């Protein structure tokens, strides 16, 4: 029976039981000692694929640990689950849908049927539609209501319609097409729209309304605000089609808004929002970096797809990262995972991975509706590495929690300034080294004595200088951030998330927890605005409504 119809209780599997025993034997394992005793440790725990180099040697593992984790992947029938996803089976069981974002990066000539229909011709038809639009805008042929060419593109969308495209377009700014600036409008907070409107001119701005339903509250409100602003700036209803296009599956709503049918790019229900940057949702990416670079992004992701499908689990980058996450979350009680990019242009990768991981694996029931038998997804957090060193790295080094970390760093900078990049790279490596090695009490005391401190001062200060070490991390190195390598990197994390969902038996492709707050928000809005006098279901919410109504003017 398919894994998603009958998920395993993973804790009952022999490999899980063996890992539990193995964890006890690893209680006093020291990474520092492991490196000292095994000169081959680095080569044993590194691999490369799709332009990415992974060093996972700074983890609380031995070859036995890896073997047991790989056995666990085998016992949950991971290979069958991967095939089921790529074949278009209904792996999103709660919504009765496939999860085929991987189809968006498959080459021309591939065939893939959904409900008996080959979807690949449609995928490439939309890519061609994107190519035509991007070419017209970049060549100055798409003009606004005053016949001036488009200079600014504003993507109106939230969640997956925003985080992935923003990450990629900013990460690849070195590849940006000159003459077109891309902006993102996501938050329903009017201040965001106000600040954006100060940077653009209506006559040369194209708005992309990205919403599968064309009914997402934040997106629709911002689209309406943009429409009103456009009209107030001198635009007309007749020329609205020059300034608004859509990515949506609700053509009727988009047309009613004023968007022409030929300017609506389709979405499919087998692509989830957080996996959608490869689709027409990636239109702002293509407008930012050009269609040829967008296709390179797809190609890099496809290369990682092939690696994921074919590499043995012990040499499979996303599988190994997923298994390490399970190892720490379920056997070492780690509750969070830090993403630390040492690259300014990758500053938004943590936000994208937060949604990708936490919306996918923030689940407490298995695919069949039964409760999970173990903890699932961790909190994903972090930020630009060098800045983080002067903020939260203190907790990573000396805090009481174990927080595994991923360091991501390029070898080559697009903007070399003196020896800045050498220092940046050195800081990345030294942080992972310090997490692993730490500083013993004896080392702290010796260091203080060398500074000429009295023995009383040494004994007083030494405890504060001790760094426990033995804190796990992975280091991902790329030669430079290119479309192809970035595509592979993002796809790798997508696959990592899926693997963990298979192990836990959860559905990585729904997000029912998001819906409840949305529905309640409508009722709260009615009470705030006087649409109903019926009190809220709890005194706290009603009290806050009353506080707002008593003070708000506007």
UniProtKB/Swiss-Prot annotation:
Source species, domain of life: Bacteria
Keywords: Cytoplasm, Gluconeogenesis, Glycolysis, Isomerase
Active site per database record: 359 (proton donor), 390, 518
Entry annotated with the keyword Isomerase: yes
InterPro entries, alphabetized: G6P_Isomerase (IPR001672), G6P_Isomerase_C (IPR023096), Phosphoglucose_isomerase_CS (IPR018189), SIS_dom_sf (IPR046348), SIS_PGI_1 (IPR035476), SIS_PGI_2 (IPR035482)
Gene Ontology CC: one annotated term: cytosol
Listed GO MF terms: carbohydrate derivative binding; glucose-6-phosphate isomerase activity; monosaccharide binding
Signal peptide start-end: none
Family, similarity comment: Belongs to the GPI family.
NCBIfam families: PRK00179.1
HAMAP family, alphabetized: G6P_isomerase
Protein name from the UniProt record: Glucose-6-phosphate isomerase
Origin species: Pseudomonas savastanoi pv. phaseolicola (strain 1448A / Race 6) (Pseudomonas syringae pv. phaseolicola (strain 1448A / Race 6))
Gene: pgi
